[in-house]
Amino acid sequence: MPILCTTGCSRKAFLKRPKTGDTLCRECFFLAFETEIHNTIEQNKLFRRGDVVAIAASGGKDSTVLAHVLKVLNERYDYGLKLVLLSIDEGITGYRDDSLETVKRNRDDYGMELKILSYDELYGWTMDKIVSKIGRSNNCTFCGVFRRQALDRGARLMEVDCVATGHNADDIAETVLMNILRGDTARLRRCCDIKTGGKDADSIPRVKPLKYAYEKEIVMYAHFKKLVYFSTECVFAPNAYRGHARAFLKDLERIRPSVIMDIIHSGEQLSFKDTVKKPLRGKCNRCGFVSSQQPCKACVLLEGLNRGLPKLGVGKKSKANRMIAAQNSLRQSANLVKTDF
């Protein structure tokens, strides 16, 4: 006897939801998945009518599903949003150039404006060039820092009201684990926030509508909806620290299926003593973008690359400051020698 959909629609069950364990038909799964994201948006007041929302589009499953679902919900519930696509070209041959073709396909399919910004035009460097200088170690540090700022720059250029990113529940849980393992209380405070930034006129908020959506269900939704997305992993990703947190999370999930939501809820409930130092977020005194240090991490990393010190800014801030001071001292000495002659 066939298993029927647990919603009582009388249709044959097609899948079992990893998140809830419910056996659902395809149509009821689509509706449940979309409704949960709608509830997340409404309960957390992520958007306001009339907002221009930039979807951070990489061509991967998360951003593709996010673009599709936001378009569906915007029309179904009359959010009154203008949706646009914002993509960052990191300059990774054989990866980002291919994925951007998928983003362009999404642009055409959904009728959304698309803006592509490259590291090369913003910073004068591509990730291929950076990796040729620093090797395969710490390359994700450069890419992550530059990408976050590139999204801010792109959002400002497009004059949007907020940026929607495709971070899913697995991503959030992994980040909580990473910050616990690194003892990074500053990032641990905000990694579970569904909305960040936007506290001053020059700061554009970011929102995570897929915060409670399981990665497995995002893949299932994209597959059964026949959405076009790019599924190749970044060629530089295998050495990323996040990979260890991801593997650990998968091991935990086999033992306790609810562990992803458990970790997220634990992260949301964490509180810190008043004596724990909390870095103040302001503007970088060089580039003017949001930062919790002076100068910002992007400016420090970029200065290191331009000075021929690619390791500058990788590691502790005090080490970076010492390296900058030493380099300045050498420059001053060189200028004095030139003056003597």
Swiss-Prot record:
It comes from the Eukaryota. InterPro entries: CTU1-like_ATP-bd, CTU1_C, Ncs6/Tuc1/Ctu1, Rossmann-like_a/b/a_fold, TilS/TtcA_N, tRNA_thiolation_TtcA_Ctu1. The keyword tRNA processing applies. Its EC number is 2.7.7.-. GO terms for cellular component: cytosol; cytosolic tRNA wobble base thiouridylase complex; mitochondrion. SUPFAM superfamilies: Adenine nucleotide alpha hydrolases-like. Pathway: tRNA modification; 5-methoxycarbonylmethyl-2-thiouridine-tRNA biosynthesis. The keyword Amino-acid biosynthesis does not apply. Its main location: cytoplasm. Keywords: Cytoplasm, RNA-binding, Transferase, tRNA processing, tRNA-binding. Belongs to the TtcA family. CTU1/NCS6/ATPBD3 subfamily. Plays a central role in 2-thiolation of mcm(5)S(2)U at tRNA wobble positions of tRNA(Lys), tRNA(Glu) and tRNA(Gln). Directly binds tRNAs and probably acts by catalyzing adenylation of tRNAs, an intermediate required for 2-thiolation. It is unclear whether it acts as a sulfurtransferase that transfers sulfur from thiocarboxylated URM1 onto the uridine of tRNAs at wobble position. This is Cytoplasmic tRNA 2-thiolation protein 1. The lineage of its organism: Eukaryota, Metazoa, Ecdysozoa, Arthropoda, Hexapoda.
